[in-house]
């Protein structure tokens, strides 16, 4: 499909432009399970702003099930450390808003509100495979004591 690695599209949107195909009708396989991505998986891959990988000059994405599954495996294998928000801001001397932090479960980039929520709730950011991770609003679970009911 794309012989020269420098000309290869890196995102789903760039691939759609290169193939002159709308996002709804794009046919891409999952790099892990090799199934053709359904439209919801294509949209999820685009929203997560993940990069396309190439195998034998063919473009591959990842379905949501595989993203969640392999994110957990990477978390177990490549976890480095956990820090609070103030410590993370002091390390690279940049504000949290300027750092790319993804959800460690679904890989969506966190917005400023989600990063601030982690700081306010006194939760930690995790360094996994050299990247900083947190939890997005969709994957957030309240702490156990917040969900317990009194009798």
From Swiss-Prot:
In alphabetical order, the GO MF annotations are: DNA binding; PDZ domain binding; zinc ion binding
Protein's UniProt keywords contain Isomerase: no
Family matches, as Pfam families: E6
Q: Provide the protein's localization.
A: Host cytoplasm; Host nucleus
GO biological process terms held by the UniProt record: DNA-templated transcription; regulation of DNA-templated transcription; symbiont-mediated perturbation of host apoptosis; symbiont-mediated perturbation of host ubiquitin-like protein modification; symbiont-mediated suppression of host cytoplasmic pattern recognition receptor signaling pathway via inhibition of IRF3 activity; symbiont-mediated suppression of host type I interferon-mediated signaling pathway
SUPFAM superfamilies, per the entry: E6 C-terminal domain-like (SSF161229)
List zinc finger spans: unnamed.
30-66, 103-139
An example Gene Ontology CC term for this record: host cell nucleus
Major localization class:
host cell
Domain of life, source organism: Viruses
Q: Which UniProt keywords apply?
A: Activator, DNA-binding, Early protein, Host cytoplasm, Host nucleus, Host-virus interaction, Inhibition of host innate immune response by virus, Inhibition of host IRF3 by virus, Inhibition of host RLR pathway by virus, Metal-binding, Modulation of host cell apoptosis by virus, Oncogene, Transcription, Transcription regulation, Viral immunoevasion, Zinc, Zinc-finger
Where along the sequence does the record place the motif called PDZ-binding domain?
A: 149-151
Q: Which family does it belong to?
A: Belongs to the papillomaviridae E6 protein family.
Any remaining note in the record? Belongs to the high risk human alphapapillomavirus family. The cancer-causing human papillomavirus E6 protein has a unique carboxy terminal PDZ domain containing substrate.
Quaternary state and partners of this protein?
Answer: Forms homodimers. Interacts with ubiquitin-protein ligase UBE3A/E6-AP and thus forms a complex with human TP53. Interacts with human NFX1 and MAGI3. Interacts with human IRF3; this interaction inhibits the establishment of antiviral state. Interacts with human TYK2; this interaction inhibits JAK-STAT activation by interferon alpha. Interacts with host DLG1; this interaction leads to the proteasomal degradation of DLG1.
Q: What function does this protein fulfil?
A: Plays a major role in the induction and maintenance of cellular transformation. Acts mainly as an oncoprotein by stimulating the destruction of many host cell key regulatory proteins. E6 associates with host UBE3A/E6-AP ubiquitin-protein ligase, and inactivates tumor suppressors TP53 and TP73 by targeting them to the 26S proteasome for degradation. In turn, DNA damage and chromosomal instabilities increase and lead to cell proliferation and cancer development.
State the protein's name.
Protein E6
Q: What organism is listed for this UniProt entry? A: Human papillomavirus 69
């Amino acid at each position: 499909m794309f012989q020269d690695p420098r000309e290869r599209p890196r995102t789903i949107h760039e691939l759609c432009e290169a193939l002159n195909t709308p996002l709804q009708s794009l046919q891409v396989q999952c790099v892990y399970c090799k199934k053709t991505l359904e439209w919801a998986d294509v949209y999820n891959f685009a929203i997560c702003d993940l990069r396309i990988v190439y195998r034998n000059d063919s473009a591959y994405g990842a379905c949501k099930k595989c993203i969640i599954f392999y994110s957990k495996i990477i978390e177990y294998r490549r976890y480095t450390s956990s820090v609070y928000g103030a410590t993370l801001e002091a390390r690279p001397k940049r504000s949290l808003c300027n750092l790319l932090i993804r959800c460690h479960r679904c890989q969506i980039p966190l917005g400023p509100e989600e990063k601030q929520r982690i700081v306010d709730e006194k939760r930690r950011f995790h360094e996994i495979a050299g990247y900083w991770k947190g939890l997005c609003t969709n994957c957030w679970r309240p702490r156990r004591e917040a969900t317990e009911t009194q009798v």
